[in-house]
From Swiss-Prot:
The modification Phosphotyrosine is found at residue 197. Plays a major role in tight junction-specific obliteration of the intercellular space, through calcium-independent cell-adhesion activity. The modification Phosphoserine is found at residue 198. GO terms for biological process: actin cytoskeleton organization; bicellular tight junction assembly; calcium-independent cell-cell adhesion via plasma membrane cell-adhesion molecules; cell adhesion; cell junction assembly; cell junction maintenance; cell-cell junction maintenance; epithelial cell morphogenesis. It comes from Rattus norvegicus. This is Claudin-3. One of its GO terms (molecular function) is cell-cell adhesion mediator activity. GO terms for cellular component: apical junction complex; apicolateral plasma membrane; bicellular tight junction; cell-cell junction; lateral plasma membrane; plasma membrane; protein-containing complex; tight junction. The gene is Cldn3. PROSITE patterns: CLAUDIN (PS01346). Keywords: Cell junction, Cell membrane, Membrane, Phosphoprotein, Tight junction, Transmembrane, Transmembrane helix.
């Protein structure tokens, strides 16, 4: 694997990791849907993993942490755990990638470095899946409730910026992890061993063994 490909894969994975952190912190997973009577509202509601915010038409914003975890929808409860695990897993993958990088001297064996880089790629792929699942789950819940006639219009939401950042983070980590997994251990080259065979010779002119070889020698 070339160093350029390794650096590209690591850079994409790190960028995806940073986007996951932004996705986790943004209080914009769900935003108010301006439909029906809510079009003339003077405030916008944002809902994230850790807090919800109310933005007034004057630009004033008030944010409040959630009082109870159990009061959150199931998709946001699961998203909290999965996103945090994804961030920690990607951070560990970054450390593993640095250990197995060709530009570092933590490991001298090239074969071991390639295997360590593959492990880092797998960790980034797992982190991408852990980010993709909760983001897609939340998006599916928002779309389902939006088209559900039983849900009041005031409670309907649209997809916020946090979900799009999460999808971008998952895509970057998938691409970066896949590039790192392309690191194949170098094949060891063995020189073919030459084995020389010598023809047996007879011990004397009268012996029966090796007469064919004796005749060939005298021709």
């Amino acid at each position: 694997m070339s160093m350029g490909l390794e650096i590209t894969g690591t850079s994409l994975a790190v960028l995806g990791w940073l986007c996951t952190i932004v996705c986790c912190a943004l209080p914009m997973w769900r935003v108010s849907a301006f439909i029906g009577s809510s079009i003339i509202t003077a405030q916008i509601t944002w809902e994230g993993l850790w807090m919800n915010c109310v933005v007034q038409s004057t630009g004033q914003m008030q944010c409040k942490m959630y009082d109870s975890l159990l009061a959150l929808p199931q998709d946001l409860q699961a998203a909290r755990a999965l996103i945090v695990v994804s961030i920690l897993l990607a951070a560990f993958g970054l450390l593993v990638a640095l250990v197995g990088a060709q530009c570092t001297n933590c490991v001298q064996d090239e074969t071991a470095k390639a295997k360590i880089t593959i492990v880092a790629g797998v960790l980034f792929l797992l982190a991408a899946v852990l980010t993709l699942v909760p983001v897609s789950w939340s998006a599916n819940t928002i779309i389902r409730d939006f088209y559900n006639p039983l849900v009041p219009e005031a409670q309907k939401r649209e997809m916020g910026t946090g979900l799009y950042v999460g999808w971008a983070a998952a895509a970057l980590q998938l691409l970066g992890g896949a590039l790192l997994c392309c690191s194949c251990p170098p094949r060891e080259k063995y020189a073919p061993t030459k084995i020389l065979y010598s023809a047996p010779r007879s011990t004397g002119p009268g012996t029966g063994t090796g007469t064919a070889y004796d005749r060939k020698d005298y021709v």
